[in-house]
């Protein structure tokens, strides 16, 4: 099993979770102080980036995959525009990604490597009702859509 930690905004928090065994670190923002903490332990750091400059700097500091966040604000056009001058970039998008063919197709056609869909795959109502079948169906449907792209 691979277990990561998300929404990390500072180096001490990253270090704490790495000591507890996290296999990767994801952040909503790009904090250059987190990269060396993760690099020292050979643990991937996926920072949240909102500009081409942030993606470029994150790559220089060893981030193989950069998270574009918030995806619903930046949109697939941002990813397509970023990849034009930087085609080597591996992009994960989160924030507003929906488990629908139209939405996922837009992101993958733009060039993302992967997507994150937390709350859209785990709706609060389904979690509160402990409707694990509904959550399982949503996840399976999303994977089927991604496989078809």
Locate predicted features.
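Glycine-rich phosphate-binding active-site loops on the catalytic face of alpha/beta enzymes
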Residues: 25-34, 68-75, 111-132
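Catalytic beta/alpha-barrel core
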Residues: 1-9, 21-30, 43-55, 64-73
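C-terminal helical cap(s) of enzyme catalytic domains, especially alpha/beta-barrels
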Residues: 38-43, 108, 124-149
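Catalytic cores of alpha/beta
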Residues: 10-20, 53-61, 78, 97-115
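Glycine-rich beta-strand-to-loop/alpha-helix junction loops that act as flexible
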Residues: 5-6, 93-97, 115-119
């Amino acid at each position: 099993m691979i277990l990561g930690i998300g929404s990390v905004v500072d180096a001490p928090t990253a270090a704490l979770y790495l000591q507890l065994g996290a296999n990767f670190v994801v952040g909503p923002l790009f904090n250059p102080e987190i990269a060396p903490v993760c690099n020292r332990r050979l643990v991937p750091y996926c920072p949240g980036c909102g500009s081409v400059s942030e993606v470029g700097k994150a790559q220089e500091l060893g981030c193989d995959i950069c998270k574009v966040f918030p995806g619903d604000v930046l949109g697939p056009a941002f990813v397509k525009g970023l990849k034009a001058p930087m085609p080597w970039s591996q992009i994960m998008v989160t924030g507003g990604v929906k488990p629908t063919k139209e939405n996922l197709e837009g992101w993958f056609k733009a060039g993302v490597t992967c997507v994150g869909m937390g709350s859209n795959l785990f709706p609060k109502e389904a979690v509160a009702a402990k409707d694990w079948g509904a959550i399982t169906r949503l996840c399976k449907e999303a994977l089927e859509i991604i496989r078809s792209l």
